[in-house]
């Protein structure tokens, strides 16, 4: 807890966000990824927090006047009620609206200039963004729990630019936090989708690549043992991706040795 609190304060101090008030609850209920997301929110933003859970992030940002208003949305009623109670406990109910909806379905484009989607799988994030093409005109702060490679590939192929990535350590693995806006991107390779397009200077990148390679190796082993007709082609594709990741890691180590 103390290590987490120190990291939280470091993130938030860099962004000139005071580290007090709801921070104790905030760190108890959220990991480094969410704390880093808070530091990325522009001063004076209007925020939509999709899948808000207990509402710690929008409440914290409102309490310290980082944002002018916030929308907390969730597909389930119970977490949204938790968010209401959090907002009431910290006296920010006037600055926050609550929406019971899937993704951004009940949020109008003019209501937010910054959209935060965190704590869900990359495939779910893709579906949310598909249903809200107006997000190309917004700042996106994204933290996929799984399938980050699918999210990266989809973003660059559908009118978004990944502008920044940062790795944060969760309980058992590393997670990527991405920022994205609308724009044209160059196509990325499968290896880039797995290891990130803006992570070469991250001190945790080598470890992240190792995690990705291990995941791909397990997938290749599973395919090899399967009875799928196209397994050889798919295994070859996975192994080629692993080889490219190994090359990228070697270049990274040479540059950081």
Model-derived segments and spans:
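S-adenosyl-L-methionine
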Residues: 1-18, 24-43, 59, 73, 77-110
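Class I S-adenosyl-L-methionine
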Residues: 2-9, 105, 111, 123-257
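Conserved SAM-binding motif I beta-strand of class I
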Residues: 49, 69-74
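Short glycine-rich anion-binding loops that position phosphate/pyrophosphate groups of nucleotides
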Residues: 53, 120-123
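Conserved S-adenosyl-L-methionine
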Residues: 63-69
